[in-house]
From Swiss-Prot:
Pfam families: LamB_YcsF. Signal peptide: none annotated. The keyword Hydrolase applies. Belongs to the LamB/PxpA family. GO terms for molecular function: 5-oxoprolinase (ATP-hydrolyzing) activity; ATP binding. Forms a complex composed of PxpA, PxpB and PxpC. This is 5-oxoprolinase subunit A 2. Its EC number is 3.5.2.9. It comes from Bradyrhizobium diazoefficiens (strain JCM 10833 / BCRC 13528 / IAM 13628 / NBRC 14792 / USDA 110). It catalyses: 5-oxo-L-proline + ATP + 2 H2O = L-glutamate + ADP + phosphate + H(+).
Length: 256
């Protein structure tokens, strides 16, 4: 039986402000990526999210981003040196590791957020700096990378365990990168269409771009954004579609 991990970005509120329905999404995901305070999240939200994950038996990963609360980590920050990127990644991983330890859970993976990830997918220096930050903290942490991107090469060079990610609710360009959120149609919302699309991704090991180009991609984990409108319905519909197709949802493992 084929298996696939469903990952979701959670803990992305701040103070009294909430983003998405974390309690519902965590029931449908097999792994979660927790905001670590730079683009969203704070110590209390991080703790609650980790405790929810522990209670549900869901693996937890750090979701580091640029220091950009105002822009939710979706604004690229130019001019950062490799050492600065490495340090901001290491800092955020360490913060979540401390919270996870306090909650009796463990951080298993790292997935870069928003603009940090988008820049790294096309920029060698940023990709290598993220990988270096992970390796410096714990070389056994799994690096979640956008399939076919520069993050893959950076992870390989750093000898990090990796899982390759595709996105359920995002459109793809012909080069395999995600369509910018600034463009119409970048974020998908039709639950049935998304579910059918993901089943094909898992079965075929490929995604279809906005122009209809078929791009072969290793598919270890599928991301559903918790802040996407209708995220809970999308996740429920997707899980049922995977079950109907004989595909088991299960957390990814080291060396997947």
């Amino acid at each position: 039986m084929k298996t696939i991990d469903l990952n979701c970005d959670l803990g992305e509120g701040f103070g009294a402000w909430e983003m998405g329905n974390d309690a519902a999404m965590i029931e449908l995901a097999s792994s979660v990526n927790v905001a670590c305070g730079f683009h969203a999240g704070d110590p209390d939200i991080m703790r609650r999210t980790v405790e929810l994950a522990k209670a549900r038996g869901v693996s937890v990963g750090a979701h580091p981003g640029y220091r950009d609360l105002h822009g939710f980590g979706r604004h690229p920050i130019a001019g950062l040196k490799a050492s600065e990127i490495e340090n901001l990644v290491a800092y955020q991983i360490g913060a979540l590791q401390a919270i996870a330890t306090a909650a009796g859970h463990k951080v298993t993976h790292v997935k870069a957020h928003g603009a940090l990830s988008n820049v790294a997918c096309e920029d060698d220096m940023t990709a290598k700096a993220i990988a270096a930050g992970i390796k410096a903290v714990d070389p056994s942490l799994i690096f979640v990378v956008l399939a076919n991107s520069k993050l893959v090469k950076a992870g390989e060079a750093a000898n990090l365990p990796m899982v390759h990610e595709v996105f359920a609710d995002r459109a793809y360009e012909d080069d395999g990168n995600l369509v910018s959120r600034k463009k119409p149609g970048a974020v998908l919302h039709d639950a049935k269409a998304i579910a059918d699309r993901v089943v094909r991704m898992v079965q075929d090991g490929a995604v279809v771009s906005v122009t209809g180009k078929v791009i072969k991609m290793r598919t270890d984990t599928v991301c559903i954004h918790g802040d996407t409108h209708g995220a809970v319905e999308i996740a429920r519909t997707l899980r049922q579609a995977l079950k109907d197709a004989g595909i088991e949802v299960a957390p990814f493992k080291r060396g997947a």
